[in-house]
């Protein structure tokens, strides 16, 4: 892959020593390099989501990742220490985004019913927008390092408990374990749909699936115990 000016800004030129990338730079140049590097990093994560979803983590090489993002395989090391670190960054990032987004949704709601409706809309939007990441999480979680597994689990537990707290405001007399089961069942319903829709080639369902998923999820979450 030819080295371009964007590669050099992103630090992807393997011939450039580290001091040449950092030393003597003006603030503007440093900012440009920082932005270019983050852009390249995000491109690698996007490529990883797609390639891991289609082929599985074990069948994707660093060269595959680099080529999909427009860099050489060795250049990937400028952004991640290895392929497992790419997987970790991908699943940690999406888990943190889910938690942060869910917390923002709940904070903006005026009451539990509104919070629940907004959470459902938020998660449906996430699932329809990120089917590849969901597939990678389901299939390749075991390929994470032990530390990344622990961090992803902690973030996702916090996300589940966010839903449980909102549900408790609606079902005040229902056992917490039951509320947690409702949340997990809802995630299963919502998360499984986008890939099944895409795998059957029915792109039309992306538009029609949104209200259907939202209504089904809310019906399950608000049904009497």
Pin down the residues of each PLM region.
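C-terminal peripheral helix-coil segments that are non-catalytic and often amphipathic
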Residues: 1-28, 125, 160-169, 173, ...
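Helical hydrophobic small-molecule/effector-binding pocket
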Residues: 117-138, 187
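Amphipathic alpha-helical segments used for helix-helix packing
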Residues: 128-147, 195-198
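Amphipathic alpha-helical linker/stalk segments
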Residues: 90-117
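Amphipathic alpha-helical packing segments from all-alpha helical-bundle domains
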Residues: 96-99, 146-171, 180-184, 207, ...
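Hydrophobic/aromatic residues within well-ordered alpha-helical segments
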Residues: 40, 83, 94, 98, ...
């Amino acid at each position: 892959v030819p080295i371009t000016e964007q590669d050099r800004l992103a630090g992807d030129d393997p011939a450039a020593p580290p001091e040449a990338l950092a030393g003597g730079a003006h603030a503007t140049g440093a900012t440009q390099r920082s932005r270019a590097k983050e852009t390249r990093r995000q491109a690698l994560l996007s490529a990883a989501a797609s390639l891991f979803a289609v082929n599985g983590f074990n069948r994707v090489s660093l060269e595959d990742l680099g080529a999909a993002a427009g860099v050489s395989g060795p250049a990937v090391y400028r952004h991640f220490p290895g392929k497992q670190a790419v997987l970790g960054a991908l699943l940690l990032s999406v888990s943190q985004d889910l938690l942060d987004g869910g917390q923002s949704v709940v904070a903006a709601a005026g009451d539990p019913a509104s919070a629940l409706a907004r959470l459902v809309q938020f998660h449906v939007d996430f699932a329809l927008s990120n089917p590849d990441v969901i597939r990678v999480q389901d299939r390749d979680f075991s390929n994470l390092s032990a530390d990344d597994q622990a961090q992803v689990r902690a973030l996702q537990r916090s996300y589940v408990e966010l839903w449980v707290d909102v549900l408790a405001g609606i079902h005040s007399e229902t056992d917490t374990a039951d509320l947690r089961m409702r949340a997990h069942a809802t995630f299963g319903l919502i998360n499984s749909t986008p890939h099944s829709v895409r795998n059957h080639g029915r792109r039309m369902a992306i538009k029609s699936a949104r209200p259907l998923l939202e209504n089904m999820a809310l019906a399950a979450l608000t049904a009497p115990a």
